[in-house]
Amino acid sequence: MAFTPFPPRQPTASARLPLTLMTLDDWALATITGADSEKYMQGQVTADVSQMTENQHLLAAHCDAKGKMWSNLRLFRDGDGFAWIERRSVREPQLTELKKYAVFSKVTIAADDERVLLGVAGFQARAALANLFSELPSREKQVVKEGATTLLWFEHPAERFLIVTDEATANMLTDKLRGEAELNNSQQWLALNIEAGFPVIDAANSGQFIPQATNLQALGGISFKKGCYTGQEMVARAKFRGANKRALWLLAGSASRLPEAGEDLELKMGENWRRTGTVLAAVKLEDGQVVVQVVMNNDMEPDSIFRVRDDANTLHIEPLPYSLEE
């Protein structure tokens, strides 16, 4: 990507975030085009893409035959097909898997590094963008297209916007917002996704979890009414036979080091500590607080105490902005 990422600064929690423009270089874009693109994606992902309108974006999982996620995708309609956003670390292997059956269909599947991904969040984000676009997305219309630009709206953890655009528009937005907005890199958007409870699947955790272990059913990312797709049998079994015993949790507190994706944590059991869970992502905020997204058993006590392995500091459970009740 020729567009240069902004220099990093410590991320801030959504409640205190000033107006911020972010380069989302840790995320990546991919597309599918061609006459069979809808039918093809319908047979590959957990969401019902046939029901998707131009005004929607959806979270979906792309699974292996055992129902384990290669990746999760933020999907939207793009041209005569679809585009999706995923973590850059998993894009190449995910596209390799997606292309396996493409030879039999009229589709072209490709990485897209021509377009630039930007995020806008923080204080009065909507007002800042209102001067630059004739229409902004909202709850009723979550995707808006204008010229070379697609804008995606997110409600949680606080209103924010993801912008998919060309380099010229990205430069224009940066020039226009530079004076009033702080500039930051992907870590700030990652912190907001952790706060929102959107699962972050990086390479270390690809092929490890069924979608429900990362709360995808609570985020509208799984259709249990659609036809066949890869891994469907295992995903359905987890729902109808209660086979899933895991959930995605948000932890906050302090730690002397950030746990890495794929690492476990420790749970306090009386005087002892027991290893538990798998970290998906973690970020240290500017106030020193550490936030961790972790997959653990879904029956954790709300007052449980955790720590990064052998650390002197502790982490506790924070509420997510959605319910896991079926």
Curated annotation (Swiss-Prot):
Role: Folate-binding protein involved in regulating the level of ATP-DnaA and in the modification of some tRNAs. It is probably a key factor in regulatory networks that act via tRNA modification, such as initiation of chromosomal replication.
Family (UniProt): Belongs to the tRNA-modifying YgfZ family.
Cellular component terms (Gene Ontology): cytoplasm
Domain of life: Bacteria
The name this protein goes by in its record: tRNA-modifying protein YgfZ
Compartment(s) of residence: Cytoplasm
InterPro entries: GCV_T_N, GcvT/YgfZ_C, tRNA-modifying_YgfZ, YgfZ/GcvT, YgfZ/GcvT_CS, YgfZ_barrel
Key words of the record: Cytoplasm, Folate-binding, tRNA processing
Residue numbers binding folate: W27, W189
GO biological process: iron-sulfur cluster assembly; RNA modification; tRNA processing
Transmembrane residue ranges: none
Any one Gene Ontology molecular-function term assigned to this protein's record: folic acid binding
Gene3D superfamilies, alphabetized: 2.40.30.160, 3.30.70.1630, Aminomethyltransferase beta-barrel domains
